[in-house]
Amino acid sequence: MDILYIIFGLALVLVGAHILTEGSAAVAEKFGVSEFVIGLTIVAVGTSMPEFVVSSAAAVQGSSDMAIGNVVGSNIFNVFLILGLCALVSPLPFTRNNIRFDIPLVFIASMLLLVVASDALLGLGEVNLIGRIEGALMFLCYIALIAWSVRSSKQDKQEVAAEPRMKMWVAVLAILGGLVALVVGSRLFVNGASSVARSLGVSDALIAITLVACGTSLPELASSLVSVAKGQKGMALGNVLGSNLFNILFILGGCSMITPLTLGDITIIDITMVVMSAVIPFIFAFTLKGRNLNRIEGAAMVAIYVGYVAWLISQVA
């Protein structure tokens, strides 16, 4: 039964990603909004709903490792694997706003997470803990950063399409239907994969950072790859960056307001990888001409993710 959940869940995710991408692109055309802004807001928040549901449920149940590990693992997965694979399909160009605002914003959010989760290292407490006040600060930062990012992206505004690809009510239904399929499909996948992993005796922390994070990030993976395949690269990049901001500031901020989150088996090394996931794309943007993420750099990012997961597994072997 678990295998059927995994297969059916994956199928729903793929179908949902296609429908969501089409609907979102239609909305962008209708209002003359850039694909990046749509990816940063509607698509990013929608595809991060599985992370929100899983982490919120884990926080309520007192499983800090699952709540934090899901977000940490998802952010690492989003950048290194998703952007890496997207770049392998087709090089991803960085816009001026990406370099000046969007990537630095993700870096700042990642550094904020590192600081608030390092109480013991900074001598502020006996354990590394994300408290309610810190969570509220992160939550408010998300609202402010999204408003600023959308406003600063106005210069990327594109012309309204003379003949939109679909009617507005159809586009709205496509977005809603796609999001529902993504959330349900991801949930089925996570339940099936987690059940299989637990039967093998794997720890909650490892499950959260790897299997659960990968499962809840399937919407981002599917929607980003479909966007790139359709030539909507701005939406793919906005989806990943927006999802990472949402995961750190909104999800962890909100969860820690529900109950303080303690880092158990989740280490500072894991959170440092989240910071590196914001630094490396920024570095790659300036390594070669054109300010884009090319196939070689994409392959390097995929290799980094594979190496990180291999290291995690080796720690419990």
Name each model feature, range by range.
Residues 1-317:
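Hydrophobic alpha-helical segments, chiefly the membrane-spanning helices
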